[in-house]
């Protein structure tokens, strides 16, 4: 990571959401490079001066997260908002004690972030899930999330009706907390949730989580990518209603010395979504994929990824992460155990693995079950992922 004396601002990018299951296979899919990733290849986004807090964006973020300090005497629909604030605060506190605190304690004890102090996290198939990205990788400066869900845009809470605001807050709260009961975010549910009027994309859930974790907002930029895989056509999110590839959010806590950044963009990560026809009939990758490939020496995280990287037509995202990342934390829905080992990773098994949910019974990995039976790792002190409903959780920590 290139640091600029204390005049710098860090970046954090987010990617995610589960992909289409039927893209065509691309013959030019790259072969995994099993070469060791040297420490000096670790990179991150460049940093710039810590910007001022954007009071308008910060107030909106506190409003949607139900923060008591967000209440303004001139806020319309005060009764609706106060009721929501009380409800969402109670649910958040329960989520903190049941899920967040056990994960934070486990992460601190495990120490993988100290052994691999990467500054960037790649989170494919993430949707709007900043929550788990932050809990498992709290020290990164840049989180890059990718998903199929639309990025979304904002609205003026003073210019919506009581009915519109009430519906928005109800839909937002449901989209945030129902997935934690399941242990994962459902792709189909997110596709429906993020097409409901004012709740129009992942931007809303990311801002909620950012606020609840004590962050303030410096800027939100709507983004596209140029042919080199760099950000282009950036404009303030307040001037956008639709049509952009994604966004980047600059944020920090009061104690942070620099601004971090979360980047989200919507893209189909199947080979058929990543490759396009270039000159002379050759396949080339799209600009967003070029951007993703720039982050060598990163960490990667996969949770409830619907086993997409078990398939040949998701080889680009699998190989890119294996070539770019010296640490991968995933559950069994990420990469196959044999794929990680073939790519040169040492794999530590965590939790327990005895089954898949019925929907993915054809993705059960017998070799992974045998490896767990041999290793006999301790149970994890939290339940996330598809098997949370069975009181069971597994993770694999792959390092090289």
What function would you assign to each model-found segment?
Residues 2-9:
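Sec-dependent signal peptide recognition
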Residues 30, 37-179, 246-253, 257-400:
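Non-globular targeting/processing and membrane-anchoring segments
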Residues 15-17:
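C-terminal motif of bacterial Sec signal peptides marking the signal peptidase cleavage site
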Residues 182-250:
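Short helix-loop boundary/capping segments
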Residues 19-21:
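Bacterial signal peptide processing site
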């Amino acid at each position: 990571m290139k640091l600029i004396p204390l005049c710098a601002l860090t970046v954090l990018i987010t990617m995610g959401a589960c992909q289409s299951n039927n893209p065509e296979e691309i013959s030019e899919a790259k072969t995994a490079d099993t070469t060791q990733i040297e420490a000096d290849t670790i990179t991150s986004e460049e940093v710039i001066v810590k910007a001022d807090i954007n009071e308008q964006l910060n107030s909106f973020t506190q409003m949607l997260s139900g923060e008591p300090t967000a209440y303004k005497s001139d806020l319309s629909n005060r009764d609706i908002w106060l009721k929501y604030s009380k409800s969402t605060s109670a649910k958040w506190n329960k989520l903190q004690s049941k899920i967040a605190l056990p994960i934070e304690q486990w992460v601190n004890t495990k120490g993988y972030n100290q052994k691999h102090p990467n500054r960037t996290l790649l989170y494919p198939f993430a949707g709007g899930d900043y929550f788990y990205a932050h809990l498992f990788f709290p020290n990164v400066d840049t989180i890059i999330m990718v998903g199929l869900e639309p990025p979304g845009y904002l609205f003026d809470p003073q210019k919506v009706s009581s009915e519109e605001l009430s519906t928005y807050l109800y839909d937002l709260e449901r989209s945030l907390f129902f997935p934690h009961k399941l242990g994962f975010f459902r792709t189909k549910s997110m596709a429906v949730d993020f097409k409901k009027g004012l709740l129009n994309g992942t931007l809303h859930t990311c801002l909620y989580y950012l606020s609840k974790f004590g962050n303030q907002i410096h800027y939100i930029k709507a983004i596209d990518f140029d042919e080199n895989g760099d950000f282009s056509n950036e404009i303030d999110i307040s001037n956008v209603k639709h049509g952009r590839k994604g966004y980047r959010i600059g944020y920090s806590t009061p104690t942070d010395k620099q601004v971090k950044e979360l980047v989200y963009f919507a893209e189909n990560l199947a080979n058929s979504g990543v490759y396009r026809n270039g000159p002379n009939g050759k396949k080339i990758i799209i600009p967003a994929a070029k951007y993703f490939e720039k982050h060598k020496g990163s960490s990667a995280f996969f949770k409830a990824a619907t086993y997409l990287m078990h398939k040949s037509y998701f080889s680009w995202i699998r190989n890119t992460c294996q070539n770019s990342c010296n640490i991968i934390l995933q559950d069994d829905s990420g990469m196959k155990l044999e794929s990680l080992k073939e790519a040169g990773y040492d794999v530590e098994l965590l939790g327990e693995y005895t089954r898949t949910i019925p929907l993915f019974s054809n993705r059960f990995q017998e070799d992974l079950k045998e490896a767990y039976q041999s290793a006999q790792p301790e149970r994890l002190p939290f339940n996330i992922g598809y098997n949370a409903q069975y009181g069971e959780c597994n993770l694999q920590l792959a390092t090289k």
